[in-house]
Regions:
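S-adenosyl-L-methionine
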Residues: 1-18, 24-43, 59, 73, 77-110
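Class I S-adenosyl-L-methionine
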Residues: 2-9, 105, 111, 123-257
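Class I SAM-dependent methyltransferase "Motif I" SAM/SAH-binding loop
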Residues: 27-28, 51-55
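Conserved SAM-binding motif I beta-strand of class I
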Residues: 49, 69-74
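Short glycine-rich anion-binding loops that position phosphate/pyrophosphate groups of nucleotides
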Residues: 53, 120-123
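Conserved S-adenosyl-L-methionine
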Residues: 63-69
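Short SAM/SAH-binding signature in class I
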Residues: 112-119
Length: 257
């Protein structure tokens, strides 16, 4: 807890966000990824927090006047009620609206200039963004729990630019936090989708690549043992991706040795 609190304060101090008030609850209920997301929110933003859970992030940002208003949305009623109670406990109910909806379905484009989607799988994030093409005109702060490679590939192929990535350590693995806006991107390779397009200077990148390679190796082993007709082609594709990741890691180590 103390290590987490120190990291939280470091993130938030860099962004000139005071580290007090709801921070104790905030760190108890959220990991480094969410704390880093808070530091990325522009001063004076209007925020939509999709899948808000207990509402710690929008409440914290409102309490310290980082944002002018916030929308907390969730597909389930119970977490949204938790968010209401959090907002009431910290006296920010006037600055926050609550929406019971899937993704951004009940949020109008003019209501937010910054959209935060965190704590869900990359495939779910893709579906949310598909249903809200107006997000190309917004700042996106994204933290996929799984399938980050699918999210990266989809973003660059559908009118978004990944502008920044940062790795944060969760309980058992590393997670990527991405920022994205609308724009044209160059196509990325499968290896880039797995290891990130803006992570070469991250001190945790080598470890992240190792995690990705291990995941791909397990997938290749599973395919090899399967009875799928196209397994050889798919295994070859996975192994080629692993080889490219190994090359990228070697270049990274040479540059950081």
């Amino acid at each position: 807890m103390f290590q987490l609190l120190d990291i939280a304060k470091n993130f938030l101090n860099q962004a000139n966000i005071p580290a007090n008030g709801v921070l104790a609850d905030f760190t108890m209920g959220n990991g480094h990824d969410t704390l880093y997301l808070a530091s990325l929110v522009p001063q004076g933003a209007s925020v939509a927090d999709v899948g808000t859970d207990h509402g710690y992030l929008p409440v914290y940002l409102l309490q310290h006047r980082r944002v002018c208003r916030a929308i907390a949305s969730d597909i389930n009623r119970e977490p949204l009620e938790h968010a209401r109670r959090t907002a009431l406990a910290y006296g920010v109910t006037e600055g926050i609206a609550f929406r019971l909806c899937a993704g951004l379905d009940a949020i109008a484009p003019q209501e937010a200039d910054t959209v935060i989607i965190a704590g869900m799988g990359g495939e779910t994030m893709i579906e949310i963004l598909k249903n809200a093409p107006w997000t190309r005109e917004k700042l996106l702060l994204l933290q996929p729990m799984t399938k980050a490679e699918l999210l990266r590939s989809w973003l660059v192929g559908n009118g978004y630019v990944i502008t920044q990535e940062r790795l944060v350590r969760g309980k058992d693995t590393l997670y990527a936090v991405l920022t994205a806006t609308g724009g044209e991107s160059e196509a990325i390779t499968p290896a880039q989708a797995y290891c990130g397009v803006k992570l070469a200077h991250d001190p945790l990148w080598g470890e992240y690549i190792d995690e990705r390679m291990a995941k791909l190796a397990r997938a290749a082993e599973g395919l090899q043992a399967s009875g799928l007709a196209d397994k050889e082609q798919r295994v070859a594709h996975l192994r080629a991706t692993i080889e490219e990741l190994q090359k990228r890691k070697g270049e990274w180590e040479d540059g950081n040795g």
